[in-house]
């Protein structure tokens, strides 16, 4: 479950601008602020099922965006490559540049 939550959080970070304000609100509250479906439904005065359906559709949309754009998978690859590169050298200046590259993401 934690792996799924972590993945959805990353996908949300990458693709949230492609979502509607309502989708962003539900996802932020559910995944980032740890609201329950019931709490979200009370705040927006909709059924718990409506919130659940919206979140599930949004998750599917995020996965669809990732299938097409690969932003998250490329990010993961960059992180792994930078870690390998860091292990290959003890040069302080190279480590500083590696950190600068990491900070760009």
Swiss-Prot record:
The record's listing under Pfam families reads:
UPF0122 (PF04297)
Record's superkingdom? Bacteria
InterPro entries in UniProt:
RNA_pol_sigma_r3/r4-like, UPF0122, UPF0122_fam_protein, WH-like_DNA-bd_sf
The record's section on NCBIfam families has: PRK00118.1-4, PRK00118.1-6, YlxM
Q: What does this protein do?
A: Might take part in the signal recognition particle (SRP) pathway. This is inferred from the conservation of its genetic proximity to ftsY/ffh. May be a regulatory protein.
Regarding protein family, the annotation reads: Belongs to the UPF0122 family.
- In its UniProt entry, what is this protein called? UPF0122 protein OB1530
The organism is Oceanobacillus iheyensis (strain DSM 14371 / CIP 107618 / JCM 11309 / KCTC 3954 / HTE831)
């Amino acid at each position: 479950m934690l792996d799924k939550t972590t993945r959805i959080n990353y996908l949300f970070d990458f693709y949230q601008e492609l979502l509607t304000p309502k989708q962003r609100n539900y996802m932020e509250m559910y995944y980032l602020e740890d609201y329950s479906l019931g709490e979200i439904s009370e705040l927006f005065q909709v059924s718990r099922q409506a919130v659940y359906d919206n979140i599930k559709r949004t998750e599917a949309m995020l996965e669809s965006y990732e299938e097409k754009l690969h932003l998250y998978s490329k990010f993961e690859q960059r992180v792994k490559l930078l870690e390998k590169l860091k292990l290959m050298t003890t040069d302080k200046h190279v480590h500083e540049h590696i950190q600068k590259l990491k900070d760009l993401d």
